[in-house]
Amino acid sequence: MLCIAAFLVLLVLAAVSAKYRRLLGTAWRCVTRRVTFRPCDTSFREDVKNSMLAPLAVRAPRLVKPASIAIEVTAWIMVLSLVLSLYIVGKSGLNLFVYGTCNPQDTQACSLSAGACSIDAGADDFGSALAKGDVVGAFAAEFRSLGKTFDALPSRLKDWDAREYLPEAASYAGGYRDGLPVAVEVIDPGCRFCGELFRNIESAGFADEHNLAYIPYPIGPDAAPKFTNSPLIADYLTAVRLTEQDDVPAMGGTDWRILEHIFTGERPDGVAWQIWFNEQASADEAETQLQDWLAEAGYDAADINDVARLAASDRVHDIVADGKRIVEQEIRTATVPTLIADGALHPGVVSVDKLQGMR
């Protein structure tokens, strides 16, 4: 490993001084033999070590052997660090291409990724498993993560057709219009980045040029969602879609007005509705507010009770669960929001300019 470490050092030195370039050539010949598991055919390794130990041999001969060992250990550390760094850079680049973030478990830890909420934030990664002392689990998590990335790679190279990922009883912003392309967004009502994408879509006039539908995806299991009231909101959105699809009295598009309230509106006290649902509202308070919005949309008391019963039904739960299956097994995104439009998958928040360029 010493000749490899020396080559790395000489590579830097040779870039700034010509006197090291001859040594660099010698080091390279040694490295090419070492990486092909052949012994070096020069004395370069010993020459490097002797040049480093010679001053010490004159002053403190007894320290030569420990210093020689330290040089070998340092060389191993340098080479292993390089290999690890190259692996991390390569894996991060692959994740960035596949998922739009270099860290699918924590999208906000990657400065190159678009704003998004992580779907797999609760899953153990290499570092967290290793911190728990689970070495086997750490490597298993790393290989599992890498395998998922490679498994999802082919799908990122295909031409995406949003119509293939529409949920049951899909609802379109502004209603369905013949002749316009279909787009689908994956959203969690509690994710602030979904609100940011929603506002960008409004600013860009994107829904005017597309039949835009959505899949509600409450991150995490129902028993422990990332955002407390997201499963309830997803159930109500789905129940409203089913209700208005059956032409029960209402103005139509009520689910989109609920999303408009959550992503863009504020309470009278100035607190954003999304923050209120996430941090302040109990389940009963959240449900009462959703029902108030239904009343504003033209639902009477009997209609609201019907929606509430439907939202708690197995039918709605099955539709929401199927939407999560579409996201996890077919779209296989690691982030919310995710937009399927213009023949491509767009993870994270999409800018207004980019949205305006999609046709």
Regions found by a protein language model. Give the residues of each.
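Loop-to-transmembrane boundary segments
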Residues: 48-83
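Structural alpha/beta surface segment adjacent to cysteine/selenocysteine redox centers
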Residues: 195-295
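Membrane-interface motif at the C-terminal end of an N-terminal transmembrane signal
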Residues: 17, 82-99
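Cytosolic juxtamembrane regulatory segments of multi-pass membrane proteins
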Residues: 36-53, 112-121
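Hydrophobic alpha-helical transmembrane segments of multipass integral membrane proteins
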Residues: 8-12, 76-86, 258
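C-terminal cap of thioredoxin/glutaredoxin-like
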Residues: 281-359
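Hydrophobic alpha-helical segments
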Residues: 1-42, 46-48
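Extracytoplasmic thiol/disulfide redox context detector
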Residues: 92-232, 312, 316-331, 355, ...
